[in-house]
Amino acid sequence: MSHRQILEALSGLLLGMFVAILSSTVVSNALPRIITDLRGGQSAYTWVVTSTLLATTATTPIWGKLSDLFSKKLLVQLSLVVFVLGSVLAGQAQTTGELIACRVVQGVGAGGLTALAQVIMATMIAPRERGRYSGYLGAVMAVGTIGGPLIGGVIVDTSWLGWRWCFYVGVPFAVLALIVLQRTLRLPVVKREVKIDWWGATLITAAVSLLLVWITLAGDRYDWISWQSGVMVAGAALLGALAARVEKRAADPMIPPHLFRNRTITLAVIASIAVGVGMFGASVFLGQYFQISRGASPTMSGLMTLPMIGGLLVSSTVVGRIITSTGRWKSWLVIGSVLLTAGFALMGTMRADTPYWHLAVFMALIGLGVGMSMQNLVLAVQNTVRPDELGAASSVVAFFRSLGGAIGVSALGAVLGHRVTGYMADGLSRLGIPASGPGGGGLPDVHTLPGPIRTVVEAAYGHAAGDIFLAAAPFGLLALVAVVLIREVPLRRSNAEPVPAGRETAEAVPAGTKD
């Protein structure tokens, strides 16, 4: 296929990804207002984000496996419909519980879009050329991430719209994406025997859910070291062990265990978990920091994150083209991990009064690091598996990245809540005010607080936000160690077979194998 033909075929897919990213990020700057209006607290704030990531995590391998069995075009259209349905329902939510449930529906659709975008690109484009188009995908993600917070801020700040329109704004784009997908995406349908590992999917979902519930509630509803923690951790471990046993024995497992005999996949998974923890877990609270600690409006909060998104846009597009030209990718993963770690560590120094230009530089480093790492980890994995396992292998990386993100949001959200409580107690005690007063369970509206108390609240959230970025820095370092240990295999120019590299491939594939 020519470059133009590929772009035409990918246009609807890229538009669908844009809808998913836009509909997710448009909420980020509106969340403080949404949670305040729905009378929620820090735990609800965390779960509105975590619920979507959890559903995305749990369903990504299912969508990936289905793509190896059914029409990829039909599946991506179905995932888009599910995502839009969740968005419309979320716009009708009257309580934080209803909103969280609707966000789960959104996450199911997002899991399909996340997994299928990578799988469809891998089906159409040889690995050597894929870096170029992965850059386009990264650019679309960057534009959606840039536009989302800005649009969300404008919607929230416009009195005759209100935050509910944050969930409706993506619907017209979704309808257009469905039409374009129907007209432009042409993929061969490969008929295979249908074997879905529902037991494995159920056990994996249950294990991850229990783990996230424990992380979210520990330190708030009960102590980290308590009988409740022991029961939940033991339960998650037991469910995880059962899932591993089921996957090992399943005829067609959801996450094929033999993939992890591939060194590249194993190390890419470790790096993806680390990137997910840092990227989702730390950056999701930026809007809260800018609005509560610095008193910014939702619109201004979106504008203030532009350096991070700009770094992501530049690195994903430029590096993708360079990788296509050279066929070499490892050095960019290493550089990206270094920048990511440095960005997190530097953001750990931020406080309520940190000069903005310092934060802009630090956020740009994080954006550059994510842009160099996220898509190229998937690319490295796809280069080492046979064509009929592209869906499973791609979804494995996306699964663990989303898992890392969900764990990161839950864990770092718990850290944020704990640190805010401690810092506010210290600050209020210096004013002679009991900490149980203004430090209640809801998110504060700093504009309604008396001057001295507002200063305490702003300082508490600023210091706590710095703490969670500092806590994310070791995960960037873990990603660096993992990518350094990956053995680079030059990108092949054909989808016919993986590069023969001994044990580097999951299984030997005869030449000429076709999807």
What are the residue ranges of the model-derived segments?
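Transmembrane-helix exit segments and adjacent C-terminal regions of multi-pass membrane proteins
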Residues: 1-13, 443-515
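Hydrophobic transmembrane-helix bundles of small-molecule transporters
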Residues: 157-271, 278, 296, 457-463
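Structural signature of transmembrane alpha-helices in multi-pass secondary transporters
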Residues: 20, 49-52, 56, 83, ...
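Interfacial helix-cap and linker-helix signal at transmembrane-aqueous boundaries
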Residues: 34-36, 66-67, 151-160, 215, ...
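A membrane-interface helix-boundary motif in multi-pass transporters
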Residues: 157-168, 217-229, 297, 418-473
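C-terminal module of multi-pass small-molecule transporters
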Residues: 11, 59-64, 68-81, 89, ...
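Transmembrane core module of solute transporters
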Residues: 5-60, 199, 213, 224-232, ...
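Helix-loop-helix hairpins in multi-pass membrane proteins, especially solute transporters
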Residues: 60-200
